[in-house]
Amino acid sequence: MDVPTDASTDTDVRAFYRALLEPRVIEEKMLTLLRQGRLEKWFSGIGQEAIAVGAAWALDERDYILPMHRNLGVWTTRDVDRERLFCQLMGREGGFTNGRDRTFHFGLPEKNLVGMISHMAAMLPVACGLGQALRYREEDRVACAFCGDGGTREGDFHEALNLASVWDLPVIFLVENNGYGLSTPTDEAVAPADIADAGAGYDMPGVVVDGNDVVAVMDAVTKARAHARAEGPVLLEMKTFRVRGHEEASGTAYVPDELIEEWKEKDPIDRFAEQAAADGVLTRDAMDAVRAELEAEVDERTEWVLQQPEVTSTPEAERGAVFAPSPEPAPPAPDAETEEVRFIDAVQDALRQAMRDDNSVIVMGQDVAEYGGVFKVTDGFVEEFGRERVRNTPIIESGAIGAGLGLAVEGLTPVVEMQYADFISCGVNQIVNNLATTHYRWGQPVGVTVRAPFGGGIGAGPFHSQSMEAWFAHTPGLKVVVPATPRDAKGLLRTALAEPNPVLFFEHKKLYRSVRGPVPTGAYTLPFGEARVARE
């Protein structure tokens, strides 16, 4: 849409002003409820609405947005069901997460929204995976991932920017620099004066934007979207300010009063209103009418939500939400043709057959392309399946696993290879806090398989020989597989690739070339969680 103050009709400008004002009016009501003891917590985005609303308005509805906890305006601009949204924010039955959360740790696939986890910058690699899926399918869409200034010091920020640049992904990295972490000023945590300067280090444009000017935000995002679609990623730094506490309980005593007052004078809604009135595209009376209309709607909706029951659940319901339903296994026929093969051959055969059967299967990891992986499991794959489906990654275990999540959200079947299982420790956050919780939080199937060569016995030393499968076996939401025979390796890997849940597939390096056994030549799957009786 055109810049709002250049819109052709008063109706256009009024609709935009309503979109800009709505999150403010909702927040004002929530803060009132908080003071009354009728709401337990709130993370305010007051003063930052221009970024959330401006970005969401400028992007196409088909584009992915990965917002943060202060971006209520993204959800309202994407026209999320208001009754469910209010139930979510107020912890009542009818919310999006069944009471497991009362903020934005969920996604809405129908709105192309992917919510955050609390670990800063963790969703940026996910945006890379979404971008790769869009590129793989040759879709004219982008992914826009929000991040705070503090989050730009996290490793996931740098891993994601590097991956997006190396792969030329259609991703916009949008940083809200609001001056503070929790209480630490940005200049005590971030070395460069402009975070946008990081773009040059990753061969992408880095643009500083006045985040309190909604027209500037829309213009920057519109241009970034065009660049991302045609040439690759863009880094936008939106300069703004957090005029309230990190959350309401912490207050703002650590912020100089004059600094808060200075930024209140730059309030984005007031700035737009003044410009719209000066340009004659929207009268003050019309703006007052919009506010009155919104306040009445919010009051009515809030009172309705307060009459809804508190969230209740049962242990059975909670356990039942951890995993998506798995397909039934298809074991081999008793008289199936078999071949005597090594353990590694069985793994390779399972992966190759799956890629032949299903174009959605994508393999990525360090050295997996022409080199074929350190243990040569993917040897010859790039020649058969091409670089779009067999992709080398940088040394970014966290970034690669997060990208796998993004690919899975978009319906692809990623297989992420760890060079050695020892290095999976660098990706634990993505595995335990992101992959493992996604279905529980918002019902999204996450069919990601992480292959990891593990164990000792080959003289590889202390950092290439560890066995850490027990770490993950204690994590709800993960399926952990450790095959012992070639037959099991092939069948269980095919099962993993058909799973709508994250699977950690540990392959013992000592077994790769030292164990042989009969393996059915055709495709088959074996059930998870059922012991095979080898001897009696």
Describe the predicted segments one by one.
Residues 1-51, 58, 238, 244, ...:
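Conserved acidic/glycine
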Residues 25-167, 185-191, 196, 201-203, ...:
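Cofactor-binding active-site loop characterized by glycine-rich and histidine/acidic residues
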Residues 26-30, 93-108, 195-196, 370-384, ...:
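Acidic-glycine-rich active-site phosphate/pyrophosphate-binding loop
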Residues 44, 65-68, 97-99, 106, ...:
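General beta-strand structural signal in soluble alpha/beta enzymes
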Residues 51, 111-177, 209-227, 369-445, ...:
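Thiamine diphosphate
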Residues 343-344, 446-469, 473, 478-479, ...:
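Cofactor-binding beta-sheet edge motifs in enzyme active sites
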